[in-house]
Amino acid sequence: DSGVKGVNTLRAIYGTGEETGMEDMENYFKKNPLPDMAFTPDSDYGICFAEKGILQLEVSTLLNNATTLSQFHAGRAVNAVPDRAYVMLDSSDYDEQTLMRLADASDGDFEFNYTIDGLMIISRGKAAHACEPDKGYNAAAALVDLISNVYTTKETGSICSFIDYAINKETNGRSLGLKMSDAVSGSLTVNLSSVNIEGQTAKAVFDIRYPVTVSVNRVL
C-alpha cells in the first residue's frame, strides 16, 4: 500500500493450537520451510527473551483406596488454577461439625450440602494461569487441606494424602524439595491443576514451571 518494494518475502503465519500442543505449526512446517527470521506478537506484553521449562505430570494410583471419600473433582485445564472443586464424603455428625468449624476459620470459601450420597463440600477459589499460581486461589488445594485436617490417610486415600504432604497449598515446590530460582526467569512454580477421584479412578495433574537455566533432570 505504501509503495515499498522489498527483496525478501514477508509472511504472516497464523496458528490456533498454542494451548493444545501446537500441532498445527508442526504440520505447516512439514510442507513449508522454516523462516530465516520470525517474531510472535503476543497481546500487549513486553518482549520475551526466555521462557521457563514446563512439566505437566499426572500422579495416579492403580486402585482408589479411600474409605470415606467417594468423589473428588476439580479442574478442567492443566494450565490453569482450578476455581472450583467438590468432594463427597461418608461422614459422621461429629466430623461434619469439625469440618464446618475449620472451614469458618480458614481463608477458603466452602459450601456444605447434604445429599443421599453423603456430605458434599464445594470449594470456590480464584482462577489464574498456571505460570502464576500465586495470583489465584486454588480451590482443589484448599479442599484437600480442609479434609486432611479431619480425616486420616486411609480415609481420604493416597492421592489426597500425597497432595497434602507434598504440596498442600504451596506454589513454590518447597515441600517437594524443588524451591529454586534464577536471575533470568525467576522462581519455580507448582500448580495443582486437577483432581479426579471416583470409583476406581484416582489421579491428580500438576503443572510445574521451572527456571530456564535449570535442567529438567534436576526437577525430575
Per-region residue spans from a language model:
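Metal-dependent amide/peptide-bond hydrolase catalytic core
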Residues: 56, 62-220
